[in-house]
């Protein structure tokens, strides 16, 4: 989600380009990193071509066989249409990249709905939909 705080000239040399001129999908390449889910027992191996941090908990819940919250179920469905999303943009299931504020995207309303849910989860102190974001405690 962020880069080390190094001099801009370092990135310019590394990329053979001016980092300030990178946009969209080119800028996205700077944030691409592999991930691994490790278990001390056999689990189904899977190669995930493209994902984002917001979906890692859905993969973990699936591998561990943990019951998902409504929110994790929502994210699981969302990742079918939009397998990767972040502050710069997102990819659809066909591999097409969209800038995050692209109002002509067929996914614009879906992204807007996701942003509202994220806001409610993070900042909705009085009106947070707790039953959606958390599992009920077992007695």
Regions found by a protein language model. Name each.
Residues 2-139:
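Solvent-exposed soluble domains appended to multi-pass membrane proteins
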